[in-house]
Swiss-Prot record:
Modification type Phosphotyrosine: residues: 310
A biological process from GO: response to cadmium ion
Keyword check for Transmembrane: no
Domain of life: Eukaryota
Annotated protein name in UniProt: Large ribosomal subunit protein uL10y
Keyword Ribosomal protein carried by entry: yes
Purpose of the protein: Ribosomal protein P0 is the functional equivalent of E.coli protein L10.
GO molecular function: copper ion binding; mRNA binding; structural constituent of ribosome
CDD domains: Ribosomal_P0_L10e
GO CC terms, sorted: cytosol; cytosolic ribosome; nucleolus; nucleus; plasmodesma; ribonucleoprotein complex
Alphabetical UniProt keywords: Phosphoprotein, Ribonucleoprotein, Ribosomal protein
Amino acid sequence: MVKATKAEKKIAYDTKLCQLIDEYTQILVVAADNVGSTQLQNIRKGLRGDSVVLMGKNTMMKRSVRIHSENTGNTAILNLLPLLQGNVGLIFTKGDLKEVSEEVAKYKVGAPARVGLVAPIDVVVQPGNTGLDPSQTSFFQVLNIPTKINKGTVEIITPVELIKQGDKVGSSEAALLAKLGIRPFSYGLVVQSVYDNGSVFSPEVLDLTEDQLVEKFASGISMVTSLALAVSYPTLAAAPHMFINAYKNALAIAVATEYTFPQAEKVKEYLKDPSKFAVASVAAVSADAGGGAPAAAKVEEKEESDEEDYGGDFGLFDEE
């Protein structure tokens, strides 16, 4: 079988990536540092059905994206270009983005601290018995780790931050962690960005609940409304408040001048004679309380009638 030339491989890659862009509208951009071929194969199997994992050189991916944009006029896909930095791959999916992201995270595997590797996290060695014999104390002394001999083995006395995040792993740290059987790092595909129908956002957005989204949306509307009111710029959210403020201003002008309009007449009338406020409130209270008065009168009248009838009965007995 004749091997494909480099040019033919590029054309095949362009064709495949363009087909995937046509078929899928959701793409996860994932970092693939320290991910082995076996691990990547397991991820592909786990996502099989509604997702496709595509790896490749950044230059090839960028070239294919530009070709697709030129051929189809899809300029939104160009938003992917700034995201193709470093050792990254693309996961094309038709599934729920959060579920796919969670599935990818399941395939992280533990890894030893190799010399020269940049630590993705802080590495802290906890106190306790190491199981190492006293002849191994030199490893601890080089790293200034306080120890003691307990029952013929080396015991670490206090927690020690062996490697800080971002630092390179040294030979002494790597050797000690290997002797302790500690695999401090875990590697897998890490979602860096999410592309969805032309929009690009952080993967943290996938963790937001519906209540959090509503809260953020309400907060945004409140901020926009406040800004619109401050600069007197009409928006749908600010319009009701602007109308109310305008009405208050017009009312204040009408009260202070001879200018008037129907809604201002009643206000002016009350301001000229404040006692009308009291009359109106008393009338309202009387109207509320008056409903129970007839019923009370009827009850009282009925009680008086009963007493009269009862007294008449005694009169009949007296005559006999």
